[in-house]
A protein has these predicted regions:
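Charged, glycine-rich active-site and insertion segments that engage polyanionic ligands
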Residues: 1-46, 100-102, 109-262
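Structural motif
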Residues: 74-76, 105
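Conserved alpha-helical scaffold flanking the Walker A/P-loop in AAA+ ATPase domains
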Residues: 9-15, 55-74, 81-82, 86-94
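Conserved catalytic/switch belt of AAA+ P-loop NTPases
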Residues: 67, 88-106, 116
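Short glycine-centered, acidic/aromatic-flanked micro-motifs in structured strand/loop junctions
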Residues: 28, 77-79
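Conserved catalytic segments around the Walker B and adjacent sensor/switch elements
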Residues: 44-54
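Conserved phosphate-coordination/catalytic loops
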Residues: 2-5, 53-57
């Protein structure tokens, strides 16, 4: 596994002390290697790994199965940010006192999306950021690396980045022209639903937009920062309409530009 030196050292200590937690929560961005890290844990404890669904029915099925297994088994709940409260509550008792051969791993983007009672019963591992040297070991395209923060980012198609860059430049042009119509026309290219795979990823757009905005100081004011920060934070929440959040931010930035001229 690339990077994650401190987390790997933690695993080694667990193994040496024979103290691998029975319930682990792995927190990190999509593409940061959470599932890969979970597989490293499973291999370390020599367990069978099973990826489970997050519905209440599948959680109950997991619990029933956990009490009948006869060999070490690790149940993985991926992207549990969106797991319903009923399902999380159903897990509480079994993760507090796991059956003899059962281990449980949850992966989440934001640990704050977990119930406090769930967090208190688990051991949290936070995925570490990757250095440019680590990312360069799997990708040698400087344009891709410019916008890569994790391993998954290095696997993006160059065409996707170029399309996103064009969208960003269209938005910048709209801000310069002080035209809300041009800005909103450009944002029609952004993905508003997960199923719209042919459209531009909102988080990638935001990353490239903030980078490009630095070259246009006339388009932001000290007051603009709060809108950028707010939108960046909102994009980390799984329940938010990311496209709408970006559009709201851009309208606010446009208002700031217009007010500067008055």
């Amino acid at each position: 596994m690339i990077g994650q030196k401190n987390n790997i050292n933690t695993l080694i200590k667990w193994r040496c002390n024979k103290s691998v937690p029975r319930f682990i929560i792995i927190s990190g961005d999509i593409g940061s290697g959470r599932l890969t890290f979970a597989k490293v844990i499973i291999k370390m404890i020599n367990a069978k790994g099973i990826i489970m669904g997050n519905s209440i029915a599948e959680v109950r099925e997991t619990i029933e199965n956990a009490y009948t297994i006869t060999e070490p088994t690790c149940y993985i709940f991926r992207n549990a940010d969106d797991m319903r409260t009923e399902a999380k509550n159903a897990l509480l008792k079994v993760v507090e006192e796991p059956p003899n051969n059962a281990y449980f791993i949850m992966t989440v983007e934001n640990i704050d999306n977990m119930l406090g009672t769930i967090k208190s019963r688990g051991t949290v591992i936070s995925m570490e950021p990757y250095s440019q040297k680590e990312l360069r070991s799997v990708c040698d395209d400087d344009f891709i690396l410019q916008y890569a923060t994790n391993i998954a980012d290095t696997k993006r198609e160059r065409a996707e980045l170029e399309r996103t860059e064009h969208c960003v430049l269209d938005v910048i042009a709209g801000l310069k022209a002080k035209s809300g119509t041009k800005i909103l026309k450009a944002t029609t290219q952004l993905r508003s639903k997960v199923t719209e795979t042919d459209k531009i990823d909102c988080i990638l757009f935001m990353l490239m937009f903030k980078s490009e905005l630095l070259y246009h100081p006339e388009l932001y004011t000290p007051n603009s920062l709060k809108y950028l920060v707010k939108c960046t934070q909102e994009l980390q929440r799984s329940s938010i309409n990311k496209k709408a959040s970006i559009e709201c931010m851009l309208v606010s930035l446009l208002d700031e530009v217009k007010n500067e001229d008055n």
